Amino acid sequence: MIGLLRRYPLPVIVLAQLFGTSLWFSINGVWLSLSGELGLAESDLGRLTLSVQAGFIVGTLTLAVTGLADRFGASRIFLVSSVLGALANAGFVLVAGVFPVDSLLRFATGLCLAGIYPLGMKLVIAWTPNYAGAALAWLVGMLTLGTALPH
């Protein structure tokens, strides 16, 4: 795996970013089914989407204020955030419609996205210094596709 990262850093990070950011609007992508099965209102979708955004803001501010992204390896934070985000997202399925637990899990997903989106940018710049501009363009493209993936 390490050899693959060294030989092809850009495809590895942009694909990881694609799948990592798919957590962002995963609930929105299945909302019609969720609302029908659980009888959730449209306002619940707004609450759950807001929970993710709030988690992301708190997470990015925490990373900035504490300097965690500079004290620990960006790839480790990215990995841990991706795994924990996937677990929080999967946990949502078990408690969908149970307020406030569902909101807390979506908030946790947002916190984890703070370790995926900005740290992915840090990784792509560090791993591809000779073509950072093009690499960032690929990364932003994957961020956009990743957030649209659930739809």
Segments the model singles out, each with a brief description of its role:
Residues 8-42, 60-63:
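Extracytoplasmic
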Residues 41-49, 98, 136:
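Juxtamembrane helix-start elements in MFS-like secondary transporters
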Residues 21, 25, 110-118, 148:
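Small-residue-rich segments within alpha-helical transmembrane domains of MFS-like 12-TM solute carriers
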Residues 13, 98-106:
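Short hydrophobic/alpha-helical segments at membrane-entry points of transmembrane helices
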Residues 76-90:
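Structural signature of the two symmetry-related core transmembrane helices
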Residues 105-141:
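Cytoplasmic helix-loop-helix junction between adjacent transmembrane helices
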Residues 59-73:
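Helix-to-loop junctions at the C-terminal end of transmembrane segments
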Residues 25, 52-61, 148:
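Residue-level signature of mid-helix packing/kink "hotspots" within the transmembrane helices
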